[in-house]
Amino acid sequence: MKNSINTSEIVNIIREKVEAFDNPIKKENIGEVISVTDGIALVYGLEKAKFGEKVFFTSGVEGIVLDLDHDTAGIVVLGNDRDVKEGDTVKCSGDVMQVPVGHELLGRVVNALGHSIDNSGEIRSKNRMDMESKAPGIIDRKSVHEPLQTGIKIIDLLIPIGRGQRELVIGDRQIGKTTIALDTIVNQKKINDEVDENQKVYCVYVAIGQKISTVAKVVNKLKESGALEYTTVVVASASDCAPMQFLAPYAGCTIGEFFRDNGMHCLVVYDDLSKHAVAYRQMSLLLRRPPGREAYPGDIFYVHSRLLERAAKMSDEKGRGSLTALPIIETQAGDVSAYVPTNVISITDGQIFLESELFHKGFRPAVNIGLSVSRVGSAAQLKSVKKVAGSIKLSLAQYRELEDFAKFGSDLDASVQLSLNKGKYLVELLKQKQHLPMPVEEQVVLMYIFSNLYDQLSRIQISDINKFKYDLINYFHTTYPEVLKKLSDSMSDDIKDDIFNIVSNFVAQFNGV
């Protein structure tokens, strides 16, 4: 008997196999590298790519889409562009750039992508946040009302900074801009040791376009002072590509936002945004965007404003956290009217202007009081500081004016001579060595003596003032620590009497009377 083929059975078997087959079609948005030049890859395809989207090259190198044309995309390569070749495949990730955040990053040195570069192992953080995020709205914010103590007398007294403020540090190279930022970070050590967890100030130091040797010195200084334990250092050195230098401040800001959004306080230092602007200019010119003033692209203002607007003091409903920004700008020959300096001055809530002439005269920190201002920080000053700081700025400004006037003639009346003499004492009191931040109560003592006990102060030789102020503070700590403790908040009449008696006795001892 001949075997007959049952076609219906075969059809049913094939149908069952087809219906049971489960291999979903996977669509990927891919493109092909046309050319690579100086860290910029021109890619054909990527029809559905989004601006700012993260992409992967065949070699595993990451990139960011920063330019979109009809059929091509301009991608900045985050790494060595030698690993990217013409004809390589590029895949879209569907995500924007993210960095790890959290307490796990404290005490660590990372690059602009959040990868560890301190040979201390991987960053084991489960939390990640988008590098680019929207700044808090008006309703989510609260006015600045809590002080951020820098430990630098001339700043805490005359140009106070509040938590949530953006205060620019501007000046020529090598006159102490980074020192001010570092001393502010170091000064938080004593404060953090005495307060609750939610009142501590965590710090992020972002080094942009600096020499690796310079960054190593900064990290060592933070280690020596014990400040690295509450600080994260984000590094995009001069040897890193322009895209990494461009991303570094946004990565540092995101790390700080974690603390802000969780009801804590954070200080972010951007050192410096001049080099950040240069890196962005380089990228924009390579992407063939039209240049504007000083060859910067038209959106350079937005690049900095969207970064600095993320610094804020949050409302009670949003956890009361804060993110304070200390951007640094380097000027050329003191020219604050250049494009990038004027941009950042208009974005921030004030500026601390450092002057080369004052620095070379030996007045350090070399802060020019006439050009420096804090627009919102005075609301955050402690009561005791407000009481003694009121007349200090005027006295210093008058002294600077009279100092120039006195050069033209020797015949000065008694009142002018008194103002000049008082100014000399004030300048000596305000001088401060680097990396020696001074607690607010010690600052109050010295300024109270100048404002109210000048007769006592004038008995000291001007050349001995530096020794006198440090010896006096040590005398307070060893003999009257309770008076200093009370001064950290307010100043009553009883405390004023105590200070008068203590200073009178000490001046007599100091002069050997």
From Swiss-Prot:
GO terms for cellular component: plasma membrane; proton-transporting ATP synthase complex. It catalyses: ATP + H2O + 4 H(+)(in) = ADP + phosphate + 5 H(+)(out). Pfam families: ATP-synt_ab (PF00006), ATP-synt_ab_C (PF00306), ATP-synt_ab_N (PF02874). Produces ATP from ADP in the presence of a proton gradient across the membrane. The alpha chain is a regulatory subunit. F-type ATPases have 2 components, CF(1) - the catalytic core - and CF(0) - the membrane proton channel. CF(1) has five subunits: alpha(3), beta(3), gamma(1), delta(1), epsilon(1). CF(0) has three main subunits: a(1), b(2) and c(9-12). The alpha and beta chains form an alternating ring which encloses part of the gamma chain. CF(1) is attached to CF(0) by a central stalk formed by the gamma and epsilon chains, while a peripheral stalk is formed by the delta and b chains. Belongs to the ATPase alpha/beta chains family. This is ATP synthase subunit alpha. It comes from Wolbachia sp. subsp. Brugia malayi (strain TRS).
